[in-house]
A protein has these predicted regions:
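RNase III-family endoribonuclease catalytic core
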Residues: 1-113, 120-121
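Glycine-rich, charged/polar anion/phosphate-binding loops
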Residues: 5-7, 136-139
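A glycine- and small-aliphatic-rich helix-loop capping segment at beta-alpha/alpha-beta transitions
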Residues: 18-20, 116, 144-150
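Short active-site-adjacent structural elements
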Residues: 107-108, 137-141
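Short acidic capping loops at alpha-helix termini that bridge into adjacent secondary structure
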Residues: 124-127
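Pyridoxal 5′-phosphate
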Residues: 130-134
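C-terminal edge-of-domain segments
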Residues: 141-159
Length: 159
């Protein structure tokens, strides 16, 4: 039976941090603020996968209060989510994720982002969709104060 999960994440943009999106380092004047690397796209994907298998959210496994996750790469979080899928006898069918940000443009980086997400989840890049949109200059996203991402995961689980 196919189970679906939805993930959403948002982080504030700050000076002095490296910007990571979909497991790829971006040249940008600001980075996302968070306890880990704050990769908003990978966090949304992680929550979608965990939600699809009824395993809570990223904070349940990697609480921001735990110092071991300080500046941790988000690929660790995705790998754990994939491990939980496998332990339950499931297989990830596909991931579809959208970044919401005014900048930077991600199109040239999408193949590398898909590869990074796929590697962390032990799936093919063909099973990963990544796209972006702006917030049409509206709200905190439009003012470039932060970035958001949403994701859907489809996972085939045994009956």
């Amino acid at each position: 039976m196919v189970h679906t999960g939805i993930g959403y994440d948002v982080h504030r943009l700050v000076e002095g941090r490296t910007l990571w999106l979909g497991g790829v380092e971006f040249e940008h004047d600001h980075g996302l603020d968070g306890h880990s690397d704050a990769d908003v796209l990978m966090h949304a994907i992680c929550d979608a996968v965990l939600g699809a298998i009824g395993e809570g959210d990223i904070g349940a496994y990697f609480p921001p209060s735990d110092p071991q996750w300080k500046d941790a790469p988000s690929r660790i979080f995705l790998a754990k989510a994939a491990e939980l899928v496998g332990k339950g006898g499931g297989k990830i069918v596909n991931i579809d994720a959208t970044l919401i940000a005014e900048a930077p443009k991600i199109l040239p980086h999408v193949p590398a982002m898909k590869a990074a997400v796929a590697q962390a989840l032990c799936i093919s890049p063909d099973q990963v969709g990544i796209k972006a949109t702006t917030n049409e200059l509206l709200g905190f996203l439009g003012r470039r104060e932060g970035m958001a991402a949403m994701a859907v995961a489809a996972i085939n689980m045994p009956d």
